[in-house]
Regions:
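Short, charged/polar connector segments at secondary-structure boundaries
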Residues: 1-135
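Tandem CBS (Cystathionine beta-synthase) repeat/Bateman regulatory domains
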Residues: 23, 170, 180-181, 186, ...
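Exposed alpha-helical structural elements
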Residues: 73-77, 92, 154-155, 239-242, ...
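Amphipathic, charge-rich alpha-helical segments that serve as recognition/docking helices
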Residues: 81-82, 129, 134-219
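Short active-site loop/helix that positions an aromatic residue
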Residues: 119-135, 265-270, 283-290
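Amphipathic alpha-helical "recognition" segments
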Residues: 132-137, 176, 201-273
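Extended, amphipathic alpha-helical scaffolds
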Residues: 278-344
């Protein structure tokens, strides 16, 4: 089905008098806005805002991709992710739409995939269910396909969701996961292309890439390769920044690996207080080669215990991470050893 070819004839889309300006491949152009019946649209499963929710669903269901041949079943799944990812923002957006209607037009592809406006679409679905009245989503329709225009679509999505039209920011972890997927894993975009799309500097994005790689390494360390949802509740973005800063100053690769393993172990256990401040104290140790050597020697037995506990787990979950983190022997070992290193 092509919305532009079938929609006007079959009367499930209607052209409005409104237009929306988009910049695609450096060309700025005003595009017509249409009112599209909700049942002809489907969510974008490549939306970075829900990337960790997608990875969790795939892991739990042992699948590589969510099947969207049954559009309504697929939409119900993603609807839940969008709602749970930021329920407060959802409530505010829905109240606003109910009061004054949809103000900002979204962007969809000709096959019905939503590129911009997933939250607004979700709110309209809720309103339709609540009022039992057919609702329409207002959006530009681009005659593009995800198969043949993937890079252009991703750059447009980033520009709309991170740039001028952004209303609610990404969670920091979702942003890192998106960067890892788009730049490191699939190599869909270069650092320069990503930076341009979100109006940021290449230097900042390069640092984000390194943090994203460290996040992926952390998941490998806990035997949960690419299970990014496990990092959602650990609040690792700022601690990863501190770890990246430490590693830049160390030349010896073996020392780098030992430090990463020690810090990754403490990401799980959170021995005391705020994790970012705690990691900064480790950074103070790392600034002195002698103190760092002593610290890593102290940490080794406890790191090995963490690894042993991880090896005993068949499938890692948030609950299992919590249980390992609360292991009395491990937690006390870290809390005793690290303050000793601070005072040397």
């Amino acid at each position: 089905m092509n919305l532009l070819e079938n929609g006007l004839v079959e009367k499930f889309i209607f052209k409005t008098e409104n237009k929306k300006r988009l910049v695609i491949e450096n060309i700025s152009k005003d595009y017509p806005v249409y009112r599209i019946r909700l049942d002809k649209l489907f969510y974008n499963d490549q939306n970075d805002r829900i990337s960790t929710w997608i990875s969790e669903y795939k892991m739990k269901n042992n699948i590589d991709k969510i099947d969207y041949s049954d559009r309504e079943s697929y939409n119900k799944i993603i609807h839940g992710f969008i709602t749970n990812s930021n329920s407060d923002a959802m409530k505010k957006t829905q109240q606003n739409i109910e009061a004054i209607g949809q103000i900002e037009a979204g962007v969809v592809l000709a096959d019905g995939r939503i590129i911009d406006g997933n939250r607004r679409f979700t709110c309209l679905r809720n309103i339709q269910e609540k009022n039992k009245e057919v609702q329409y989503f207002e959006a530009v329709i681009l005659d593009y396909s995800i198969e043949h225009n993937e890079k252009q679509i991703k750059m447009l999505e980033l520009m709309l969701q991170h740039g001028v039209d952004e209303k609610v920011g990404y969670s920091p972890i979702e942003r890192l996961v998106g960067i890892y997927h788009d730049i490191v894993e699939t190599k869909l975009l270069t650092i320069a292309e990503y930076a341009k799309s979100i109006n940021d500097t290449e230097k900042n994005i390069a640092m984000e890439v390194e943090k994203a790689k460290l996040l992926a390494e952390f998941l490998e360390f806990i035997n949960a390769d690419k299970q990014f949802h496990l990092a959602r509740h650990l609040e690792l973005v700022d601690p990863l920044k501190e770890l990246y800063s430490m590693l830049k100053k160390i030349n010896d690769e073996e020392t780098k690996d030992d430090l990463k393993n020690a810090v990754f172990s403490q990401f799980i256990c959170k021995p005391t207080g705020d994790l970012t401040r705690y990691t900064r104290k480790i950074k103070d140790i790392a600034n002195n080669p002698k103190h760092l050597k002593d610290y890593l020697e102290e940490q080794l037995p406890i790191v090995e215990k963490v690894c042993d506990n991880l090896e005993e787990v068949d499938q890692l979950t948030d609950k299992k991470i919590g249980e390992i983190g609360e292991n009395k022997e491990i937690k006390e070992g870290f809390s005793v050893l690290t303050p000793k290193s601070w005072t040397n």
